[in-house]
From Swiss-Prot:
Catalyzes the ATP-dependent phosphorylation of L-homoserine to L-homoserine phosphate. PANTHER family: HOMOSERINE KINASE, HOMOSERINE/4-DIPHOSPHOCYTIDYL-2-C-METHYL-D-ERYTHRITOL KINASE. GO terms for biological process: threonine biosynthetic process. Coiled coil: none annotated. GO terms for cellular component: cytoplasm. NCBIfam families: PRK01212.1-4 (NF002288), thrB (TIGR00191). This is Homoserine kinase. Pathway: Amino-acid biosynthesis; L-threonine biosynthesis; L-threonine from L-aspartate: step 4/5. The gene is thrB. It is found in: Cytoplasm. InterPro entries: GHMP_kinase_C_dom, GHMP_kinase_C_sf, GHMP_kinase_N_dom, Homoserine_kinase, Ribosomal_Su5_D2-typ_SF, Ribsml_uS5_D2-typ_fold_subgr.
Length: 292
């Protein structure tokens, strides 16, 4: 059995820890069979090949939640780079949870997502759901609550460009530097942006979605980890982007616009000017996990 789980853009614009969407590339792929012990083999990026692997953590978590004994032999094709801002740990965690669910015959969304979040917490120190949830559902997702699980979904299908520089931004550090309180004016601005962005998504107005890619809650404090952001953001807009923003906690950047190849090239060249190579993905939003 084999499951493919996509990369995700979390913290989409003003929706810190709430908005997220799956994208077509890159992705993680997990093959698995029942076994008499836990085993995991990894191809691609370097991640643990023992019980610390988040796919194993999540699969075990689901078995524990339902009181079942389970052992799997897994082979993980790891194409989403860790610490990329593209939901790497969330994708592997969800893959593990879905594998366990398939073997155990579990179809409960809440249980599967709860198990996947156990893997996410093991990796990042926080059980935030804005990678796991959109990867699971495949739509643009709005997390009202994780416990109980309440998710609002907006079907989307629009092209975008993602640029991934050869820089790492550790998720734990990116969360640690956030303040416990923000100014009232910033909170009000984010509410306004979030409401308008949801309206634009429901009407398919991608140009307005791009214009609303702004945040006052998290990004201002994370810029110390991404001093290059203003440079690449300007390069994207100068190349015709409707808007550009950080994916997750970075360093990946995504942008919306008409000529995505030109926009991606401009962002990559802006990184190259500071001595950093970058990969460019022309892909689509609105992709979820699926069985192969």
């Amino acid at each position: 059995m084999r499951i493919r789980v996509p990369a995700t853009i979390a913290n989409f614009g003003p929706g810190f820890d709430v908005f997220g969407v799956g994208i077509g590339e890159p992705y993680d792929e997990l093959k698995f069979v029942e076994s008499d012990e836990w085993e995991i083999e990894v191809e691609g990026y370097d991640v643990p090949t023992d019980g610390r692997n988040v796919a194993v953590v999540a699969a075990r978590a689901l078995a524990t939640l339902v009181g079942e004994e389970l052992y799997l032999r897994m082979k993980l094709r790891k194409e989403i780079r860790p610490r990329s801002g593209l939901g790497s740990s969330g994708a592997s965690s969800l893959a593990g949870a879905l594998a366990a669910a398939r073997v155990l015959g579990i179809e409960d969304d809440g249980l599967i997502i709860k198990a996947a979040l156990a893997g996410e917490e093991a990796a990042s120190g926080s059980a935030h759901g804005d990678n796991v949830v959109p990867a699971y559902y495949g739509d643009f997702t709005i997390i009202e609550s994780l416990n109980p699980l309440r998710v609002h979904r907006i079907p989307v299908d629009f092209p975008l460009v993602v640029v991934l520089p050869q820089i790492e931004v550790p998720t734990r550090e990116a969360r640690r530097i956030l303040p416990e309180r923000v100014p009232m004016g910033d909170a009000v601005r984010n509410v306004a942006l979030a409401g308008a962005l949801v309206k634009a998504l429901t009407s398919g107005d991608v140009q307005t979605v791009g214009r609303l890619l702004e945040d006052r809650i998290a990004l201002p404090y994370r810029l110390r980890l991404m001093p290059w952001f203003a440079r690449v953001w300007k390069a994207a807009l100068d190349a015709g982007a409707y808007g550009a923003f950080v994916s997750g906690s970075g360093p990946a950047i995504f942008a919306l616009g008409e000529d995505l190849h030109a926009i991606g090239k401009a962002i990559a060249e802006a990184f190259l000017e500071i001595g950093v190579d970058a990969e460019v993905y022309i892909t689509r939003a609105g992709v979820g996990a699926f069985w192969l």
